Every structure is written in structure tokens, then in C-alpha cells.
Amino acid sequence: HGRAETEALLEGLTILPPRVVEHRGTTLREFDLDAALSRRPQLILMDELAHTNAPGSRHPKRWQDVKELLKAGINVYTTVNVQHLECLNDVVAQITGVRVSETVPDSVLEQADDVELIDLPPDDLLQRLKDGKVYMPEQAQQALQNFFRKGNLIALREMALRRTAERVDQQMEVYRRDHAVDRRHDRAVDEIDDGDGNADAESQQHPEQGREEARLAKHGRAVL
């Protein structure tokens, strides 16, 4: 995308030349899946997991390219924005007013060996947009006026924290099952004190909501 910051991070890494595709008078540069399979590196870094490949590609979506790489024994580090998760598509549309067309199936995320949340406060992300560190200037201005408004970013950040917390909970449940661990230590999560030793009144009225907020706070901090 012509970002100087990204170019600097790539220094010293082997870059696989893109596959050039001509489509409707436009030159597109796509990930060369066959070249990657031929080289068989131990690890590939690939951005934008939800990307739609150019017409004529072997797979319509980049996440399908990743699955083929994994099947061939090649490890992949990739990135995906929370708004591209299929399970959140309807919620994202309701909050932002934008229906995201490029999505990644939930199963792809669930099959990942590890998921790391890259958390950035909305104000910091907005500044990066203004500085041209996310999109080129023309694209950045359009993004700031539409999808990437501060209210939307706050909501998307919360969704990312919640989705990551859910994954941590699932991992904990598997660990408990495999190691026959009981749930007695969950009491610390189920009881939220207000500082005077009394549980928060709203949490008492809505215990399930209180527990969810506690899990979000507990696990959210753990993955930042």
C-alpha cells in the first residue's frame, strides 16, 4: 500500500513477488500461491486474511489460500480485522450502518493455533489514519468520514476484546476438562466488589451481565 512504516518492517525479509493479473483495464497484484508452494518456506507472513482474490485465481478468498498452505505444511502468520469475522457481520452492520462484504468463516479463527489481539485505542488509530499509516491519504480521508468514525471504533474495539475473551474462556474449559479442574476459583470472577466489600448493585440485578463484564476485564487485560 506504499506505507513507509511497513516497508521499513519488511527490511531483511524475503518477499515473494506478486502474481500480476490484468482485470478490466486494471493491473492487480495478488499473492502467488503456486510460487509459495514451490518454495515451501517454513513460515509465510500474509496480510488481510479476508481479502478477495482476483478473478481467475484458484481460490476466491485469501483464507482459502492459507488453508492450502497449511495443508502443505507451511506455517502462516496472518491478520484480520474484527469487522471481517463472519459471526459478527450482522452486529457490525447494525452498529456502523455498513455491511462488510469480505468475511472470514468462524471456523478459520477457531482452527488457529494462536490468536493475538492487537489492541489500539480509537484516538491512536484515528491519528494513524490521519498520518497516512493505514491508507493512502485519499483513502484515509474517506475512511475517517465513513466507517472509521470514533463511535464505530469504540464498538469494534469492544467486540474484539469480547471475541478474544470468549476464545480464552473456551481454552480454559478445554483445560479444565482435560485436567479435571473444578470451578471453585471462578467465585472471584462471579463476585464484583465495589470497594466496600459489597457486590455491585447492577451486577446483583443482572448476574449474567456482571459475570460477562468481569470476564471481559480479566481476559481483556491478559491479551493486550
Each language-model region and where it sits:
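Conserved nucleotide-binding/hydrolysis micro-motifs of P-loop NTPases
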Residues: 1-4, 50-51, 76, 82-87, ...
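Loop/turn-to-beta-strand initiation segments
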Residues: 40-43, 72-78
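Conserved ATPase-coupling elements of RecA-like P-loop NTPase cores
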Residues: 48-63, 87-90
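Conserved phosphate-handling catalytic cores of large alpha/beta enzymes
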Residues: 83-114, 118-133
